Every structure is written in C-alpha cells, then in structure tokens.
Curated annotation (Swiss-Prot):
Record PTM N-acetylmethionine, positions in chain: M1
Function as written in the Swiss-Prot or TrEMBL entry: Inhibits the activity of the calcium ATPases ATP2A2/SERCA2 and ATP2A3/SERCA3 by decreasing their apparent affinity for Ca(2+).
Membrane topology designation: Single-pass membrane protein
Tissue expression as described in the entry: In the embryo, expressed in heart, epidermal epithelium, salivary gland, brown fat, intestinal epithelium and bladder urothelium.
Subunit description: Homooligomer. Can also form heterooligomers with other sarcoplasmic/endoplasmic reticulum calcium ATPase (SERCA) regulators ERLN, PLN, SLN and STRIT1/DWORF. Monomer. Interacts as a monomer with ATP2A2/SERCA2; the interaction results in inhibition of ATP2A2 Ca(2+) affinity.
Cellular localisation: Endoplasmic reticulum membrane
The protein's name: Sarcoplasmic/endoplasmic reticulum calcium ATPase regulator ARLN
Region (Disordered): 1-36
UniProt keywords, alphabetically: Acetylation, Endoplasmic reticulum, Membrane, Phosphoprotein, Transmembrane, Transmembrane helix
Amino acid sequence: MEVSQAASGTDGVRERRGSFEAGRRNQDEAPQSGMNGLPKHSYWLDLWLFILFDLALFVFVYLLP
C-alpha cells in the first residue's frame, strides 16, 4: 500500500514538472516579427553574406601574384 502511494506521488511530481516545463518552453519561444512570420534573424542574409565573402576571398587569392 505504501509503495503504491509513493509511486503515485512520483507520478504527480512528474506531471507537475512536465506542465511547468511546457509553460516555460512557451515563454522561451522567440516572438515572430512582422505579419509574414519570419524570425527576427534572417538566415538568408547570412547565406548571401557567406557566398559573397567566399567569392571575394576566392578572387583575392586567385589574383595574388
């Protein structure tokens, strides 16, 4: 009888912890900016900057004497 009460007590703790973590997860989500739903940081900009930097570095190394 005591074992079943202890087991049910741990399940209650797990349920409470799970609901707390779920609530905390919702608060940690980044808010969406604008109406189009894009994140605040655009990774397309990072991609294009990387490509441009890569091309500039290639041209610089290619033209070295």
